[in-house]
């Protein structure tokens, strides 16, 4: 007789964060309200935008392709008060909105694709959009925009921080509090690895790559970009306890330009402590939680700490290489 296939996993609700940081699974910082909502800030990531500011302080960093083979970042902070000066802030896309929605996040960006704007409107998501709020919620760095040599295009000179975001939030009447579930099912005894991953190389496209090197001394993966350590402008390195590398079917939307992400399900890998295990991920609709499973349907337990999440083109050769 043929073996019975494993049953389709039935998603179990992720726990409310309560006293824990919803994005890291660690205790919340002193003075942070238990019902504080996370903030998700869109940040440019192409070579002309470097160096960035405020990424090392983010609890979660999400990287996905946009147009032209480049990637963009979404930096998530567990509460608005913890947001340092961050940027350069750029426009959002619907795939990033879909990731942020189940976390009850307040989104921060300057502009959006028409698809992202439609999704924001349909879902009623709270969005601090600099296209409408301008200097109420964002700051233009005049010194950074000086003409070359050494100057930046104006779109890479807009930044924000906790105080500016709070001003934008209050201007729009956004509630800073709400129910927040944890991003993952966190555990001090994470699901054991099945292979080694002390180095990880990611290829999003011919123009966008990322690398990670694990340090046993720190227990963290240090990120690299364009072959060099990825640091904030002040030199702080970007380091993570967890790497979630998710294969995703990526095509083009009907306009032939904007990327279309199938955010419902796929395969991937989870790296922590120098090890890796394969997984299956499921999300469903835009507001549904992201769930991580083993092949037998057991939910993956993730180590508390900061996480980097990448959505990579399914089927791309050498999109992920472990060393």
What are these regions (language model features)?
Residues 6-58, 67-323:
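A surface/extracellular/periplasmic glyco- and lipid-processing/surface-interacting theme
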Residues 1-3:
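Sec-dependent signal peptide cleavage junction
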